[in-house]
Amino acid sequence: MNRKHLPFIFALLLCLSPWVSSPTALVLGFLLASTGLVPSQLPISTYTKKLLSYSIIGLGFGIQFQQAIAVTSDGIGLIVVTIAGTLLLGFLVAKVIKLETTTAYLISAGTAICGGSAIAAVAPAIKAKDQQIALALATVFVLNSLALFIFPVIGHALALDQQTFGTWAAIAIHDTSSVVGAASAYGEQALTTATTLKLARALWIIPVALLSAILFARGNGEEGKRKLVLPYFIFWYCAAIAFSDLFPQFESVYQGIFSVAKQALVVCLFLIGCSISVEKLKSAGAKPLIFGLSLWVVISTTSLSWLLLTR
């Protein structure tokens, strides 16, 4: 490295601090890549995939399995339908607009489950490239930012009660951070409902990632045999959830691990941002954003309509 790469080192260290959010980290990496300040000799892709796996495992310690299942028993049906419906709709829309399959699937997974965390979990399972991950994350983050402001306004305009708004936010907003932000702005009960449902929704990272590995099994060797690459970190993610539930006396330790994992994920997003530039975005076109927006509008309107009809 030389002096030219000092901004990269500084930005990386900054992402280790609690002052940089995930969207900011992604933007920082993107800006450095666009200005040629990312060291070309670093195997960033390798570092990113390993750190992503470790981060997802650590996040498992922050999910209270039994509590999430118990509290969300009434809403589990809607969660399953919306997840399956979003993935299916994403497949169909991608075919119509001819969007590259892997990028479309990542955006669909992020929309269906829990935004950036779902994308981060599914990406290694389907061997997604950094550019594909970055495009999916960028799309989700843009829509997340809009949701943070739009959802409370719509909720008040329609006079939604606290539970209805909390349920809607948990289903229709991608990332947990934006769900919590929008729900807290609406009310305390909405916040409780939204947070619990969103955590239960996050549990679906496990089966979706495993299913993704099967669907995206690649051909291997000259004979063209199918090779299944199992995302073993998902099993460790599941083990982390189970362990923290079986041994609750170490809650303070789990919270520490969870906090470190969240910060590591911020670093991952910075590294992913370093893999994409203005030139690459231009070559991708507007299709990813159009695709993500289409899915988001459909899932938001249909879930809200169902909640209004059944309340």
Curated annotation (Swiss-Prot):
The listed locations are: Cell membrane
- Note the InterPro entries from the entry: UPF0324_pro
Q: Which UniProt keywords apply?
A: Cell membrane, Membrane, Transmembrane, Transmembrane helix
Q: Does the keyword Cell membrane apply?
A: yes
Indicate the transmembrane segments per the record. 8-28, 51-71, 74-94, 106-126, 133-153, 165-185, 197-217, 228-248, 256-276, 289-309
Q: Which domain of life is it from?
A: Bacteria
Q: How does it sit in the membrane?
A: Multi-pass membrane protein
State the Pfam families in the record: Cons_hypoth698
- List GO terms (cellular component aspect): plasma membrane
* Record family assignment: Belongs to the UPF0324 family.
Could you identify this protein by its name? Answer: UPF0324 membrane protein VV1_3166
Origin organism is: Vibrio vulnificus (strain CMCP6)
